[in-house]
From Swiss-Prot:
It is a multi-pass membrane protein. One of its GO terms (cellular component) is chloroplast thylakoid membrane. GO terms for molecular function: chlorophyll binding; electron transporter, transferring electrons within the cyclic electron transport pathway of photosynthesis activity. It comes from Pyropia yezoensis (Susabi-nori). One of the components of the core complex of photosystem II (PSII). It binds chlorophyll and helps catalyze the primary light-induced photochemical processes of PSII. PSII is a light-driven water:plastoquinone oxidoreductase, using light energy to abstract electrons from H(2)O, generating O(2) and a proton gradient subsequently used for ATP formation. Belongs to the PsbB/PsbC family. PsbB subfamily. It is found in: Plastid, Chloroplast thylakoid membrane. Binds multiple chlorophylls. PSII binds additional chlorophylls, carotenoids and specific lipids. The chain crosses the membrane at residues 21-36, 101-115, 140-156, 203-218, 237-252, 457-472. PSII is composed of 1 copy each of membrane proteins PsbA, PsbB, PsbC, PsbD, PsbE, PsbF, PsbH, PsbI, PsbJ, PsbK, PsbL, PsbM, PsbT, PsbX, PsbY, PsbZ, Psb30/Ycf12, at least 3 peripheral proteins of the oxygen-evolving complex and a large number of cofactors. It forms dimeric complexes. This is Photosystem II CP47 reaction center protein. It comes from the Eukaryota. One of its GO terms (biological process) is photosynthetic electron transport in photosystem II.
Length: 509
């Protein structure tokens, strides 16, 4: 037919067999990519330190999605929680990856079969003998099947009745593990950070969808509605499907970027708003204050802070710090975290306790300023020494460490104090290995940032696709150029293929 590249999908119009074939092939590609990507990530993933080198620091993309559904173990004998496992069986990273690849192969063969055997009796209207699809009935079938799956996921998989449950953690991402979840049927179920809402909403949505599917299978649409919504046109199906996809993409952008029960920070990394609001900093300070109030010494109180919690309170783990054109995992930026050095407390020669003002998310450089408890600037690292009044040397600042690798150490020399003041500007102080991965010192974003950026773009493109195909199906007669001066016209709805000589024609009246 000599179609241009952007019109090639015309070949599956009014060809139900090959329409099924291309959908089978598309699903095969998706399943094959998912399985192959999982195997690739497993090949490069280092499970040795789940606290300071978790999967989101290593740039893993599909593994966090597997883990949140309950896949945490590997045939290699490790678990993402740091434990040793034996015989994880099929419900493991490798097992799930291989089942997707096997599924992909079977779908590939099915696609070929349907491409070859495209002209089935099933696709012909018994009254006319012409190709026809009962699209409202097909909609009912799809709605019923997807709703059964939705209900089953909420009622069995998430609740643990027949399945592992889902990833559940505390509000600070320290104690996460896979647990069965009880449905939350009250107002608390609408809290996006409550995993109980995942179970209850899938059960509720599945129930409504099953009823709606049965309705669409048993009740025919009114003729006026059928014509008004162009229910007989396959491009209507395409347009409405695209709208469902772009809406889902927009929603997942929000749940990923702002955080939710389905995007736990242990699997995808912290959100930028947790850095902006000092979320982890406040929790750490509260825990330290409570420990000191219970009689613990400051060094002991800080030593009780989990390394995992301290690591979240570091700007390099903020997904907004990585530029969109800086490819690679976080570890290729600041390096592989090796140890928490501890919490530095600065003092001037008058005994005032100073803290370093932290860098805001969207700054690449920021002045190093030390303030007292009242927010008054007492020391800094000056840009011009000649005019400095508050330099580390002039003010006589010292740095004392509590907790971590440097617990109990005090630094009096200005170069060391400046070094740790610069590090404290970025949150809690960590030691990084930048040699192993040849890390360049430039921050990268986490999978949370990449997912959001990608899906926001997909959603925008699909939004325009929805408008395009929706307009084409509603105003098809206008776009086709039907008018009084047209002497010969293709009869729409019989055959729409460009260049198809078998299309029925009618003369001008």
């Amino acid at each position: 037919m000599g179609l241009p590249w952007y019109r090639v999908h015309t070949v599956v119009l009014n060809d139900p067999g090959r329409l099924i074939a291309v959908h089978l092939m598309h699903t095969a590609l998706v399943a094959g990519w998912a399985g192959s990507m999982a195997l690739y990530e497993l090949a490069v993933f280092d499970p040795s330190d789940p606290v300071l080198n978790p999967m989101w620091r290593q740039g893993m993309f599909v593994m966090p999605f597997m883990a949140r559904l309950g896949v945490t173990d590997s045939w290699g004998g490790w678990s993402i929680t740091g434990e040793s496992v034996s015989n994880p069986g099929l419900w493991s990273f490798e097992g799930v990856a291989l089942t997707h690849i096997v599924l992909s192969g079977m779908l590939f063969l099915a696609a070929i079969w349907h491409w070859v055997y495209w002209d089935l009796e099933l696709f012909r209207d018994p009254r006319t003998g012409e190709p026809a699809l009962d699209l409202p009935k097909i909609f009912g079938i799809h709605l019923l099947l997807s709703s059964l799956l939705c209900f089953g996921f909420g009622a069995f998989h998430v609740t643990g009745l027949f399945g592992p449950g889902m990833w559940v953690s505390d509000g600070y991402g320290v104690t996460g593990k896979v647990l069965p979840v009880a449905p939350a049927w009250g107002p608390e179920g609408f809290n996006p950070f409550n995993p109980g809402g995942v179970a209850s909403h899938h059960i509720a949505a599945g129930t409504v969808g099953i009823l709606a599917g049965v309705f669409h299978l048993t009740v025919r649409p009114p003729q006026r509605l059928y014509r008004a919504l162009r229910m007989g046109n396959i491009e209507t199906v395409l347009s409405s499907s695209i709208s469902a996809v772009f809406f889902s993409a927009f929603v997942t952008c929000g749940t990923m970027w702002y955080g939710s029960a389905t995007t736990p920070i242990e699997l995808f990394g912290p959100t930028r708003y947790q850095w902006d609001s000092g979320y982890f900093q406040q929790e750490i300070e509260k825990r330290v204050e409570n420990a000191i109030a219970d009689g613990a010494a400051p060094s002991e109180a800080w030593s009780r802070i989990p390394d995992k919690l301290a690591f979240y309170d570091y700007i390099g783990n903020n997904p907004a710090k990585g530029g969109l054109f800086r490819a690679g995992p976080m570890n290729k930026g600041d390096g592989v975290a090796e140890a928490w050095l501890g919490h530095p407390v600065f003092q001037d020669k008058e005994g005032r306790e100073l803290s370093v003002r932290r860098m805001p998310a969207f700054f690449e450089t920021f002045p190093v300023i030390l303030v007292d408890k009242d927010g008054i600037i007492r020391a800094d690292i000056p840009f011009r020494r000649a005019e400095s009044k508050y330099s580390i040397e002039q003010v006589g600042v010292t740095a004392s460490f509590y907790g971590g690798k440097l617990n109990g150490q005090v630094f009096n020399d200005a170069p060391s104090v400046k070094k740790y003041a610069r590090k404290a500007q970025l949150g809690e102080v960590f030691e990084f290995d930048r040699t192993t991965l040849e890390s360049d010192g430039v921050f990268r974003s986490s999978p949370r940032g990449w997912f959001t950026f990608g899906h926001a773009n997909f959603a925008l493109i699909f939004f325009f696709g929805h408008l395009w195909h929706g307009s084409r199906t509603i105003f098809r007669d206008v776009f086709a150029g039907i008018g009084a001066e047209v002497t010969e016209q293709v009869e729409f709805g019989a055959f729409q293929k460009l260049g198809d000589r078998s299309s029925k024609k009618q003369g001008a009246v």
